[in-house]
């Protein structure tokens, strides 16, 4: 009897996992990411995050987001200024949007992109950075952001780390007062 009960439980868990995977294919992470007719956007972002995770890894389409694109991403824009690790979704107030990485091979701090070469699904984001031909892929675990950059052959691989990147420094007077980096292995 115990074996039968355990078998039924294991089978049920397997079905639940399969159903969850099938359902996520209907999710469109771009819903609520763009302003309509000059109004405010839904303040959502298409990037990677895990349920109850500490990291919300997504592109920044503004150097200093404000009310109109408080999540750091606006679908109507076509420039990426980096990939931030924390952000709020749907709040209408820009906050977090810090610890930004930007892949480059020439020191550029931004790159054009098109939505034709941008993909998102729950837990995953990918975009081709047009200016230098760098493919960026992002995913997360509960406590980590994972980046994978593919650079064109023969180009230098550089990453700009901006620990002073924060939402709308101008109008709200925010500034980072202390930041540090510790390299454990190189």
Describe each region flagged by the PLM.
Residues 1-4:
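Positively charged n-region of N-terminal signal peptides that target proteins for export
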Residues 20-186:
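Accessory carbohydrate-recognition regions in carbohydrate-active enzymes
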Residues 7-14:
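Bacterial N-terminal signal peptides
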């Amino acid at each position: 009897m115990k074996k039968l009960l355990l078998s039924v439980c294991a089978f049920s868990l397997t079905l639940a996992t399969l159903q969850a995977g099938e359902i996520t294919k209907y999710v469109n992470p771009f819903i609520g990411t763009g302003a309509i007719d000059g109004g405010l956007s839904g303040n959502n972002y298409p990037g990677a995050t895990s349920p109850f995770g500490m990291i919300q890894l997504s592109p920044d389409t503004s150097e200093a987001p404000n009310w109109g694109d408080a999540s750091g991403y606006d679908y109507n824009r076509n420039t990426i200024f980096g990939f931030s690790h924390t952000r709020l979704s749907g709040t209408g107030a820009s906050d977090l949007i810090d610890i930004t990485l930007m892949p480059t091979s020439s020191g550029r701090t931004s790159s054009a992109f098109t939505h034709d070469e941008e993909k998102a699904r729950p837990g995953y984001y990918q975009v081709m950075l047009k200016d230098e031909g760098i493919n960026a892929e992002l995913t997360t675990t509960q406590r980590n952001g994972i980046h994978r950059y593919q650079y064109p052959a023969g180009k230098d691989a550089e990453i700009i780390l901006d620990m002073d990147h924060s939402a709308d420094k101008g109008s709200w007077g925010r500034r980072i007062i202390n930041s540090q980096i510790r390299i454990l292995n190189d």
